[in-house]
């Protein structure tokens, strides 16, 4: 294939992108300086560990510009090969997180830890492990301090003593990864290809089951079954080194269930902190917040530490709320439990919500799990319990496209309207939802359609300092009074 010469349009876009980067860099440096001078805990928007609005906008703009530069200057064929093999980046990170490499490095000298020492503790042959770590160093995760020594950098350090974040890496790289491997076949199959049934996905093919993912996660099985699914899924890597002991009934819980619950806390901390500060929770006083399908209560856990007047009810399947009540909250916020500020209720969100007239009904990462018909049922079950003053907050990704959406802000031209590279995780999660549960990350128009079908009306999309937004919905007759 002959090399194609660049056009005047390409040159113009390159200059425009360079100017955006130059201007944005100045904003980032100014915001970094302001952060360094500010007293600890006095962020510009009262949000520890959260960037100012100006810094957040600058971050996503410069990441979008980096993506545009990559598009403009890369050799097309080389770029195709690069993207085709990027799954190895994810696998290398999974190996490092699963073997707790960041924690091993944190316990060593600042100058780095020798690969032989890392290898001995991680139980991976040193030359192979060194190649994996060099790969990660090349994409800015970890740093190499000598020919055979490695240390954490600011990126890998995020995993040190961070079980929830580690769990998220495990979540998407265990059965989630195996499901993605089966996705091409599933899309072409005459039965599963056009289906949005939660039990007809690539994930069922991967783990060799007819159960839904939630039913499978809650199974109790013989220990040896954890490594012998009968399908394409090999199980959690560490199980190769030893299976858990049988419990009194001769069975064990799947480790993926606990990983799932903990990962929701980890993901919430990354993308959910903004929702604690970018919505006016303080104005609600002692309002009752019902977290529908709330898992172990990860988001109320965040809110409870910032707004001590708020009250919470966490609703989900029995084994999940049990994990929140008995393991997560006693460790993370026992005071809220003792004060009765949080309750855990077993509930299926397809049934009419048992809590009537709550101030806020909160749906985080629920609707993206389900296709449209299921979502309308979930929303209608909440609507029937809402009072005139009630509000529904949907915490989900609101997908923009590279050509933009009239309901969402766009990046400056010539950058992709949806901020391109900045949204890579959002689109990746959309395909993960497709692979595992036939779920969907939706556009504003798609959310409006769901709400209308359920007898609700979209009031506002809260643009938060996150890739995940808050969609506020109300009963139609109250929309004019809010």
From Swiss-Prot:
Active site, renumbered: 368 (proton acceptor)
Lineage top rank: taxon: Eukaryota
Record InterPro entries: COMT-like, O_MeTrfase_dom, Plant_O-MeTrfase_dimerisation, SAM-dependent_MTases_sf, WH-like_DNA-bd_sf, WH_DNA-bd_sf
Single GO MF descriptor: protein dimerization activity
Tissue specificity statement from the Swiss-Prot or TrEMBL entry: Specifically expressed in conidia.
Transmembrane segments: none
Any one Gene Ontology BP term: methylation
Residues bound to S-adenosyl-L-methionine: 293-294, 316, 348-349, 364
Result of knocking out the encoding gene: Resulted in loss of trypacidin production.
Pathway the protein contributes to: Secondary metabolite biosynthesis
EC code: 2.1.1.-
Keywords: Methyltransferase, S-adenosyl-L-methionine, Transferase
Role according to the record: O-methyltransferase; part of the gene cluster that mediates the biosynthesis of trypacidin, a mycotoxin with antiprotozoal activity and that plays a role in the infection process. The pathway begins with the synthesis of atrochrysone thioester by the polyketide synthase (PKS) tpcC. The atrochrysone carboxyl ACP thioesterase tpcB then breaks the thioester bond and releases the atrochrysone carboxylic acid from tpcC. The decarboxylase tpcK converts atrochrysone carboxylic acid to atrochrysone which is further reduced into emodin anthrone.
Entry's family note: Belongs to the class I-like SAM-binding methyltransferase superfamily. Cation-independent O-methyltransferase family.
Protein name in the entry: O-methyltransferase tpcA
Species the sequence originates in: Aspergillus fumigatus (strain ATCC MYA-4609 / CBS 101355 / FGSC A1100 / Af293) (Neosartorya fumigata)
Name of the gene: tpcA
């Amino acid at each position: 294939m002959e090399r194609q010469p660049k056009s005047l349009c390409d040159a113009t876009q390159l200059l425009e992108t360079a100017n955006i980067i130059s201007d944005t860099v100045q904003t980032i440096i100014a915001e970094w300086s302001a952060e360094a001078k500010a007293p600890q805990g006095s962020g510009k928007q009262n949000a520890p560990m959260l960037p100012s609005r100006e810094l957040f906008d600058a971050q996503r703009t410069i990441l979008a510009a980096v993506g545009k530069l990559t598009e403009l200057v890369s050799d097309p064929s080389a770029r195709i090969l690069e993207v085709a093999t990027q799954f190895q980046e994810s696998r290398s990170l999974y190996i490092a997180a699963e073997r707790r490499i960041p924690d091993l490095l944190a316990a060593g000298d600042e100058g780095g830890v020798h690969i032989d020492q890392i290898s001995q503790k991680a139980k991976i042959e040193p030359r192979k492990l060194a190649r994996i770590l060099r790969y990660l160093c090349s994409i800015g995760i970890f740093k190499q301090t000598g020919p055979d020594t490695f240390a954490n950098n600011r990126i890998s350090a995020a995993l040190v003593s961070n079980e929830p974040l580690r769990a998220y890496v495990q979540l998407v790289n265990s059965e989630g990864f195996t499901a993605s491997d089966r996705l091409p076949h599933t899309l072409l199959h005459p039965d599963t290809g056009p289906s949005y049934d939660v039990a007809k996905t690539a994930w069922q093919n991967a783990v060799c089951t007819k159960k839904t993912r939630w039913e499978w996660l809650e199974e109790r099985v013989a220990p040896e079954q954890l490594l012998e699914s009968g399908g394409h899924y090999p199980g959690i890597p560490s199980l190769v080194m030893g299976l858990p002991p049988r419990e009194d009934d001769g069975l064990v819980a799947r480790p993926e269930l606990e990983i799932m619950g903990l990962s929701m806390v980890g993901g919430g901390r990354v993308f959910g902190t903004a929702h604690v500060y970018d919505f006016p929770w303080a104005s609600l006083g002692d309002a009752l917040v019902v977290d529908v399908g709330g898992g172990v209560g990860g988001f109320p856990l965040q809110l409870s530490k910032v707004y001590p007047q708020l009250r919470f009810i966490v609703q989900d399947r029995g084994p999940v709320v049990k994990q929140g009540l008995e393991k997560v909250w006693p460790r993370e916020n026992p005071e809220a439990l003792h004060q009765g500020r949080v309750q855990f209720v077993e509930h299926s969100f397809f049934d009419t919500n048992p809590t009537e007239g709550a101030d806020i009904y909160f749906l985080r990462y629920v609707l993206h799990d389900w296709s449209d018909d299921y979502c309308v049922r979930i929303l209608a079950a909440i609507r029937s319990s809402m009072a005139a003053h009630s509000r529904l907050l949907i915490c989900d990704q609101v997908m923009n496209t590279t050509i933009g959406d009239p309901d969402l802000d766009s990046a400056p031209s010539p950058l992709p309207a949806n901020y391109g590279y900045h949204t890579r995780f959002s689109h990746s999660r959309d395909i993960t939802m497709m692979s595992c549960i036939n779920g969907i990350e939706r556009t504003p128009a798609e959310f409006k359609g769901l709400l209308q079908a359920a007898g609700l009306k979209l009031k506002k999309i809260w643009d938060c300092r996150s890739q995940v937004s808050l969609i506020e919905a109300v009963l139609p007759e109250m929309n004019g009074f809010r």
